[in-house]
Design a protein with these regions (language model features):
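Metal-dependent phosphoester-hydrolase catalytic domains
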Residues: 29, 222-233, 241-367
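Beta-strand-turn-beta hairpins that frame and shape the catalytic cleft
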Residues: 30-37, 46, 145-147, 174-200, ...
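Metal-dependent phosphoester/phosphodiester hydrolase catalytic core
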Residues: 53, 186-219
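Structured beta-strand-rich core segments of catalytic domains in phosphoester-bond hydrolases
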Residues: 102-190
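Bacterial Sec-dependent N-terminal signal peptides
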Residues: 1-32
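Active-site environment of divalent metal-dependent phosphoester hydrolases
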Residues: 104-106, 132, 201-203, 240-246
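Active-site metal-binding loops of divalent metal-dependent hydrolases
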Residues: 42, 102, 198, 238-239
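N-terminal, active-site-proximal structural segment of metallo-dependent hydrolase catalytic domains
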Residues: 27-115, 121, 125-137, 320-323, ...
Length: 367
């Protein structure tokens, strides 16, 4: 009985979100000039080789997923197909695309060389991180539009006033993804892009860990804003939290409207979308937006003649400044998970899908 009620509730949420997605996709076919900044969780993009010291055995040919070269090639093709579809939809490739759940630089090199997206000439920023499974974050960028000045991997630490559930001994053993920061130039303006994959949800636990990750990203952002007045910053990633959770609102200072922003706050274009019922993934029977991109005041509001955030969807008097990219081929078409992202594995079986997340993006321009 409980299972049936959950399934019924899930179907209701799916119908609502499909209606919303239909509106978004129909309304956002043509976007204005400018640069596209996006994020995509690639859902376990592993190669077929063991990385020393990492627990990647599940994604080996003799592992539990029987992760063969054919499956890996299929996965690469699928990821490139989505990136190409976004480019076809928008009339151009992303300038910046943050990614998560990638095993190493090698898989990104294989991805950007796929024929579907090779003409974008994406370049890569990546650092090997301490995650026990070996999953990292990375950044793809177009060198004709973005010039890298600096990049670094920011480690996760517990040096905070947050009260953690983990004991000091457990904190010593804790490993998660580093945060990637890439600073550079678009036209004559300085930017910094942060790519995050905050600690996963483990039942009701982990809120403090994600709050700390958000706090780290915020603290480094503020340092950059003070060091480089006027710098434009975007913090993106799989936050494993919704836009209205404490990690985003309290620790990353995410605000729903630009009018609410202080000089060191961030505008979260996905907060109003989340409240309106949109989702980038289905988690425990509910639609969530974990794939979030926040921008600082300099990027949100801008100045005359300079790049700033642009609306992607307008409905009556309301404008949405973020977009969740969804297409039928990326969506489960039947079965109990109909209407949700079409993932690589389902119930332990390889189904050859794309990702359990939809990609998200924003647009910056001058109009």
């Amino acid at each position: 009985m409980v299972v049936k009620l959950i399934e019924k509730a899930m179907r209701k949420h799916i119908l609502i979100i499909l209606a919303l997605f239909s509106f978004v996709c129909a309304s956002a076919q043509k976007i204005g000039p400018g640069y596209i900044i996006g994020f995509y969780n690639l859902e376990n993009l592993f190669d077929t080789y063991h990385d020393e010291g990492k627990n990647d055995y599940q994604y080996l040919p003799d592992g539990s997923n029987n992760w063969t070269e054919a499956k890996y090639e299929k996965k690469l093709h699928n990821m490139a197909t989505v990136i190409r579809a976004m480019a076809d939809d928008n009339g151009r490739f992303h300038t910046i695309l943050g990614v998560s759940e990638i095993e190493n630089r090698h898989v990104l090199e294989d991805l950007v060389s796929q024929p579907e997206i090779a003409d974008a000439n994406f370049q890569i920023v990546h650092y090997d991180g301490p995650d026990r499974r070996g999953v990292d974050v990375g950044l793809l960028y177009r060198p004709d539009q973005f010039t890298v000045l600096e990049s670094r991997s920011i480690p996760y630490t517990f040096d905070s006033e947050i009260v953690f559930e983990l004991t000091p001994e457990e904190q010593e053993q804790f490993r998660t993804r580093d945060i990637l920061m890439v600073r550079g130039m678009i036209e004559d303006e300085m930017y910094a892009f942060f790519v995050c994959h905050l600690p996963s949800r483990l039942g009701s636990k982990g809120n403090d860990l994600r709050s700390r990750g958000a706090e780290i990203a915020y603290q480094v952002s503020v340092e950059l804003m003070r060091q480089y007045p006027g710098i434009k910053i975007a913090v993106m990633g799989d936050m494993n939290d919704n836009p209205d959770n404490d990690s985003m609102v309290i620790y990353l200072h995410g605000r729903e409207t630009m009018e609410e922003m202080g000089p060191e706050d961030f505008f979260d274009p996905f907060l109003s979308m989340f409240k309106a019922g949109y989702g980038s993934l289905a988690y425990q029977g509910e639609w969530c937006i974990f794939d979030i991109i926040l921008v600082n005041e300099a990027l949100a509001k801008g100045t005359s003649g300079k790049l700033r955030l642009q609306p992607l969807v307008k409905k009556r008097k309301k404008a949405f400044y973020g977009r969740i990219f969804q297409r039928d081929f990326m969506t489960q078409q039947d079965g109990p998970y109909k209407g949700t992202p079409f993932r690589t594995y389902s119930s332990g079986a390889f189904v050859g899908g794309y990702s359990d997340h939809y990609p998200t993006y924003i647009l910056i321009g001058k109009k």
